[in-house]
Amino acid sequence: MPSSTSLVRELRNISEKRGLVIASTADIHSPKHLEELRKAVKKVRERPDLVLLAGDLINKGKVDWYAPTIETISKLEAERIIAIFGNEEYDETHDMLKEEFGDIVTFLDDESIKLEIKGVSLGVVGTKGSLEQPTTWQERNIPGIREVYEKRVKKVEKLLMELDSDIKILLMHYSPTFKTLFGEYRNIWPQLGHRGYEKVIEIARPDLVIHAHAHNGSKRAVLWNIEILNVSFPLWREIVVVKLSKRADLEQYF
């Protein structure tokens, strides 16, 4: 039986022998939730093949807290750690974080990667995502931010369509749908995500979509039989663990 301290969701058809174990979290805002993260890591009973981090590991660009956060996550002993940047990893910190932690963490910034794990090819597209309504600060300080967000939607679709792998995962910070925002005030939903990605998901058909940012939102939603997981740590208070099988198995299930 799965531990009650972790979510083990069997998506469609799971092969216990060949399934990939993926652990995911985000919104640690270190040091705010760092101690609680340490406790959560100790409760994960299954060694993951891959860790996916959906941004905001640190609070307000405090890069000094990235090291203890990654050190904690590394105790999961996964084969690979992939991360994206959230809005709290300020743009000016990206190069610094890549340089300092690039040997431990693979950072994806509107990029994709293809891995071979347990004989299964797994592709990940990683992006900060977009907002339908940029924040007041963004409007004032980032020239052309609305255009940046709209172009990113199209770029992510292109990256997913070009990804040739048994399993495809879309890893984002901002929400790709409003369906996982229930629990947040409705008037701020446009500043938490962008529904343009719903069409991307429908067209490109990733096997799993992971996002964060909505601390008080919903844990999951389903779009076109595709699981959308909001892995925000303040929402779960634990590491989210998912098992995925090969696409061939998924097709046989339906």
Where are these regions (language model features)?
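A structural motif corresponding to the C-terminal end of an alpha-helix
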Residues: 76-77, 158-167, 200-207
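Structural motif
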Residues: 21-22, 50, 122-123, 167-169, ...
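Active-site flanking residues adjacent to catalytic metal/cofactor-binding acidic residues
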Residues: 26, 54-56, 86, 172, ...
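Conserved catalytic scaffold of divalent metal-dependent phosphoesterases
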Residues: 15, 95-187, 232-233, 247
